[in-house]
A protein has these predicted regions:
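A structural signal for short, well-ordered beta-strand segments and their strand-loop junctions
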Residues: 1-2, 26-27, 70-72
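A short beta-strand motif characteristic of beta-propeller blades
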Residues: 2-8, 45-50
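Surface-exposed ligand/attachment interfaces on beta-rich extracellular proteins
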Residues: 7-11, 16-17, 53, 267-269
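Beta-propeller and closely related beta-sheet repeat lectin domains
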Residues: 14-16, 22, 59, 108
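Generic structural signal for coil-to-beta-strand starts
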Residues: 23, 31, 67-68, 75
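Surface-exposed extracellular loop regions of Gram-negative outer-membrane beta-barrel proteins
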Residues: 25-50
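Beta-sheet repeat architectures centered on beta-propellers
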Residues: 52-67, 73-289
Length: 289
């Protein structure tokens, strides 16, 4: 065993987080340093991989093995070896910057859900007065599909935790009635030694994300169905596994305000009847909880 003392290179502000693993990363407010074990007299080698960008707060950094995700003053990023890659450039960063309650940025927390390959940031939105320290939204990044989503949830903290061993004798601690447990006993959830996403809820109690599904809302990108021509839509067929409500949004010029249809319910044929004409279209689909 060996150790030493070294001064960090550069002037990147306070150290806010340090990640572990085969390679370590030291996050400062305006700098990221890679830490490699090399042994000998040097022991650890420190290399600056981001001289002008760091983490806003330590709790905005999360990790799944060698995949590191963090929120900086200019958006969301992922570390891949020596590369700091933007993952929220343009639309995601703009949305988060406009939706965040900037009076309480210190309450942003991040965690990884390795079971579902998600990097998640819990934050207070502009619609939340946040006087009690409770956040109300999660920004979610699937680092396999590279897709983003938003969830409305009230919590003060999120974190990843190990699932402990579960036996028939211990099930009474969870519930005295097995029929009231809403997680199938056949799922890998009950296997010990796996990491799962946990939270401190709005009542400041430890919780897990095992409840019933929330309402899902999807909106397609804006599309010109027939380039250079108008179109008329009379129905939409959502490919979903439940009943859904659809709103069609249209405009004739990109400078125009968006016009929305009334919400349409799915009929017995799986089609949502609508009647909307225009040049540019997008569909908003809501799937009930």
């Amino acid at each position: 065993k060996s150790s030493d003392t070294q001064d960090l290179p550069g002037s990147g502000g306070q150290v806010v987080a340090i990640t572990s693993g085969e390679v370590g990363y030291v996050f400062r407010q305006d700098q990221i340093i890679r830490m490699d074990f090399v042994g000998g007299a040097t022991i650890f080698r420190f290399s600056v991989i981001s001289p002008n960008r760091g983490a806003v707060f330590g709790q905005t950094v999360c990790q799944d093995n060698r995949q590191i995700f963090f929120y900086a003053s200019d958006g969301f990023f992922q570390i891949n070896g020596d590369q700091v890659l933007p993952i929220g450039a343009e639309k995601v960063n703009r949305f988060f910057d406009s939706d965040l309650n900037k009076a309480y940025t210190d309450r942003i927390t991040a965690a990884v859900d390795p079971f579902n390959t998600l990097a998640i940031w819990l934050y207070p939105s502009k619609d939340n007065p946040n006087t009690t320290g409770i956040c109300d939204k999660m920004l979610i990044y699937n680092y396999v599909t590279q897709k983003w989503s938003v969830a409305k949830i009230k919590a003060s903290q999120i974190f990843k935790q190990f699932v402990t061993i579960n036996t028939v004798e211990l099930m009474d601690i969870i519930s005295e009635n097995l029929d009231e447990i809403n997680i199938s006993l056949d799922t890998p959830y009950w296997t010990s030694g796996h990491l799962r996403l946990g939270a401190i809820d709005e009542n400041f109690k430890a919780a897990i994300f095992s409840g019933t599904n929330l309402e899902a809302e999807l909106e397609t990108k804006e599309t010109e169905l027939f380039p250079g021509a108008r179109a008329n839509i009379t129905g939409v067929r959502p490919i979903v596994d439940a009943s859904a409500n659809v709103v069609i949004k249209t405009r004739n010029k990109l400078a125009d305000a968006v016009t929305s249809s009334t919400s349409s319910s799915m009929n017995d044929s799986g089609i949502n009847p609508v009647r909307q004409s225009g040049r540019y279209f997008r569909a908003n689909v809501k799937i009930p909880a």
